Amino acid sequence: MEQLQAVIENAFERRAEITPRNVEANLKESVAQVINMLDTGKLRVAEKINGEWVVHQWIKKAVLLSFRMEDNSFIKGGFSNYFDKIPSKFADYSSRDFRDGGFRVVPPAAVRKGSFIASNVVLMPSYVNIGAYVDEGTMVDTWATVGSCAQIGKNVHLSGGVGIGGVLEPVQASPTIIEDNCFIGARSEIVEGVVVGENSVISMGVYIGQSTKIYNRETGEITYGRIPPGSVVVSGNLPAENGRYSLYCAVIVKQVDAKTRSKTGINELLRGI
């Protein structure tokens, strides 16, 4: 693995020079190996080690290099045709492959090769980009998008129209992470490497990036970039010091433990705010 990483790191330093016509065979093979391991879940861009998320930047660099190495090509689809650098994850799938994968894909969901879909995942008509990791039992609802290299935990519900930001455009240092057992309400956007802690509930229409103020109603504390585990979050506003205007923020209205979260419906948690 160290040798593979070295090839990727060295090539990334001269990425501006790389084209589909001059890419070395060794580099092309190395990047393809990384993409295939991402596709099968043997590698992931970020993983939790000793309770902390660790980002493997070299894997993200391999994903970025794949765009430099490939020309657009014709991609045949069931309802249309496409022209892109990255093939569909399911381009060569048979019915047995789908059964072995243990997930369900509703047309016209689009999933790029190099993303991992675990068992018992349901993909409604949605989009999952390269490098993403979608763990067991998660629902990606209609028109939801899972951005490049985003990490989605177990038993997560991404409601209709949810946007989970990627790392490729614009380039971000860390992927957006939604931990286990989270509910993300319809049309919410979580981007720019924000981490949503496990067992959290994000209400409908909440937008959180790295510059979004996250206000804890109980403590009065303002933080950025991370939602603590067990948080119930709604959209809100904070007044300016001069009182002449207010700016958008995300408000943590309560925090619940995993036991309460498992016994309480989403509507109940949001209704009593």
Curated annotation (Swiss-Prot):
Enzyme class, one word?
transferase
Catalytic activity annotated for this protein?
Answer: (S)-2,3,4,5-tetrahydrodipicolinate + succinyl-CoA + H2O = (S)-2-succinylamino-6-oxoheptanedioate + CoA
Q: Name one GO biological process term.
A: diaminopimelate biosynthetic process
Q: Does the keyword Acyltransferase apply?
A: yes
Pathway terms, separated by semicolons? Amino-acid biosynthesis; L-lysine biosynthesis via DAP pathway; LL-2,6-diaminopimelate from (S)-tetrahydrodipicolinate (succinylase route): step 1/3
Q: Where in the cell is it found?
A: Cytoplasm
Q: State the coiled-coil residue ranges.
A: none
Q: What is its EC number?
A: 2.3.1.117
**What name does this protein carry?**
2,3,4,5-tetrahydropyridine-2,6-dicarboxylate N-succinyltransferase
Species: Nitrosomonas europaea (strain ATCC 19718 / CIP 103999 / KCTC 2705 / NBRC 14298)
Q: Which gene encodes it?
A: dapD
